[in-house]
Amino acid sequence: MSKFSFNIYHQHKKARSGIIVTAHGEMRTPAFMPVGTRGTVKAMLPESVAETGADILLGNTYHLMLQPTAERIVQLGGLHKFMNWDKPILTDSGGFQVMSLSKLCKITEEGVSFSSHINGDKYMLTPERSTEIQYLLGSTITMAFDECTPYPATFEEAKTSMQLTTRWANRSRNAFVKREGYAQFGIIQGSVYEELREQSSKDLVELDFEGYAVGGLAVGEGQELMFKVLDYAPDFLPQNKPRYLMGVGKPADIIGAVSRGIDMFDCVIPTRSGRNGQAFTKYGTVNIRNSKYADDNKPLEHDCLCPACRNYSKAYLHHLVRIGEILGSMLMTWHNLTYFQNLMSRIRAYIKLGKDFDFDS
């Protein structure tokens, strides 16, 4: 089994490209991770997701602990076998969903108590329990339990939240079962305050995680402020470890973040947009519901190799989406995931050539 490692092969200014080696294979960086919240990427077969070029998927601890439960998944051979995906899987810690989906959640030093959004059952999620669930799932990359600081937050609010995340990170690290080829990432918090981001980074770097995530962004602060934070936040982290920007997925945001030193991304944008009839292309977004596509016999993108573009016209996709056929969601999602993987491939090629990014989609 391979050791977990991150090898940077090319660098242009702050942008890096390389390979992360894991127990479940290699992943190219910069990487975009499709979101498979409940053990599936919506409207896609796992093997179809692989065909888009994805090297890694994201799963969600909160949803999987509720249904079908981590204990059931481990009895069935782990998440990889359960969903027929043999490449790396990263699972988030569940904290963000607990705090955003549960109507009744209480944050204490111990963890977060909450009621299930499904049936109201009461649960307690702690750093130790979150780490245990991710271990049972067989996650390749486990995320430390954190509090995602809401925006806006005062300096004192952000400081209190960041310090709690640091204490939880210590507990998460102690609970993590180290195995060859597996990793745990710490999550940097501190809102939009440079002093807090620096302190959070120092505290978590001391714990020697295998990688680090920049959390608490893309929560309403806007691109300009997000980029301002990213102008300095990655510089506080080790050069030789992966950096993951959580929940960011707009093409222009990805390009801007890569140029500031970020290596990994995840977002529901390509899948959710696809199900809603929006396609991403190099020339901008296409709302396939628009009546102007009813008689358009051309593909979404002439040089895209996804099934939607190879085999079907915009008129056919328009028809499927307008009448609510499942195939419409499948083809639009397949195209969007292919577009995002093509975008990452293009980004990696520019870094290898030492070129500035001259595109934003």
From Swiss-Prot:
Region (RNA binding) location: 247-253, 271-275
Keywords associated with the record: Glycosyltransferase, Metal-binding, Queuosine biosynthesis, Transferase, tRNA processing, Zinc
GO terms for cellular component: cytoplasm
Cofactor-binding details, from the entry: Binds 1 zinc ion per subunit.
Binding site for substrate: 92-96, 146, 189, 216
Catalytic residues (positions): 92, 266
Domain of life: Bacteria
Keyword Transferase: yes
Keyword tRNA processing: yes
EC number annotated for this UniProt entry: 2.4.2.29
Disulfide bridges in this chain: none
Biological process, per Gene Ontology: queuosine biosynthetic process; tRNA wobble guanine modification; tRNA-guanine transglycosylation
InterPro entries given in the database record: ArchSynthase1/Queuine_TRR, TGT, TGT-like_sf, tRNA_ribo_trans-like
Record GO terms (molecular function): metal ion binding; tRNA-guanosine(34) queuine transglycosylase activity
Function of the molecule: Catalyzes the base-exchange of a guanine (G) residue with the queuine precursor 7-aminomethyl-7-deazaguanine (PreQ1) at position 34 (anticodon wobble position) in tRNAs with GU(N) anticodons (tRNA-Asp, -Asn, -His and -Tyr). Catalysis occurs through a double-displacement mechanism. The nucleophile active site attacks the C1' of nucleotide 34 to detach the guanine base from the RNA, forming a covalent enzyme-RNA intermediate. The proton acceptor active site deprotonates the incoming PreQ1, allowing a nucleophilic attack on the C1' of the ribose to form the product.
Known partners and oligomeric status: Homodimer. Within each dimer, one monomer is responsible for RNA recognition and catalysis, while the other monomer binds to the replacement base PreQ1.
Protein name per Swiss-Prot or TrEMBL: Queuine tRNA-ribosyltransferase
Gene source species: Rickettsia peacockii (strain Rustic)
Organismal lineage: Bacteria, Pseudomonadati, Pseudomonadota, Alphaproteobacteria, Rickettsiales
